[in-house]
Amino acid sequence: MNLLLDTHAVLWWLSDDPTLSEAARVAISDPENTVYLSAVVIWEMRIKQGIGKLDLPDDFEEVVDGQAFSKLPVTVDHANAIVRLPAIHRDPFDRMLVAQAVVEEMTIVTRDRNIAEYGIDVVVA
C-alpha cells in the first residue's frame, strides 16, 4: 500500500505521540507499505514554524531524513487535479494532499474527517 502522511500524522509519528492510532502505527511501520512525505507537509510545517505556531527541533531535517519516507514533490498534475475536487475542504494544504492521493492512487493517513469525504482511502491517524 502507498501511504501519504498528513501533517499531524507526521508530527505524531516523529514524536512517538500516543495520539497516533495503532492502525496508523502498524501501517506506517509495515515494510510492505511505501510511506510518502509530501513537500506540501514540509511546506505547511515550515510556514507554521515561521509564524510561531509550531516548534520544530533544530535537527528537524535530519530527523525526517532518518525516516524511511519516500519524498513526494508537487507536480503540475497534482496542481491541475485540484480543480476536479469538490469543495469539501477549504485548507489548501489538505486539498493538495487529496489531489496528490488521487493522482498517485495513495491512501492518506489522517485524523481529518473532511478528507475521508472525498471518497479516497484513509487510514485513521
Positions of PLM-derived features:
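Phosphate/NTP-binding elements of NTP-utilizing enzymes
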Residues: 45
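Active-site neighborhoods of divalent-metal-dependent phosphate/nucleic-acid chemistry enzymes
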Residues: 57, 61, 66-114, 125
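Short, well-structured N-terminal submotif of metal-dependent ribonuclease cores
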Residues: 1-37, 50-62, 104, 113, ...
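Short glycine/serine/threonine-enriched helix-capping/active-site loop
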Residues: 37-38, 74
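Short, solvent-exposed loop/turn segments at secondary-structure boundaries
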Residues: 49-51, 85-86
